[in-house]
């Protein structure tokens, strides 16, 4: 009976992981440096350092303000740093807009958030991100 229960638990965990992975979007991330205020979403109100500026597609005229995203580095976008990823995942809060044409990524992470998932020397990385 215990073996059957373990199989059910194992299957359930696998299913959750597959569904989580299946809903992840892909894109690129860059980073910006302090000061982080003022921001488009919160003005002069500090929101910490695990924050991000969203590209116009995600920002959606401010609808994404305050939303949280789990971001994982999946690899390099250039040959400068062939293995930039640290293996970590970071959760960030959208506090700002990364406007075109200057925005070079899907999500512009704070320097601290970017550094937790990748080598800053890479400058730009491929990512998977999921709203949490």
Where are these regions (language model features)?
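Secreted/periplasmic proteins
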Residues: 2-132
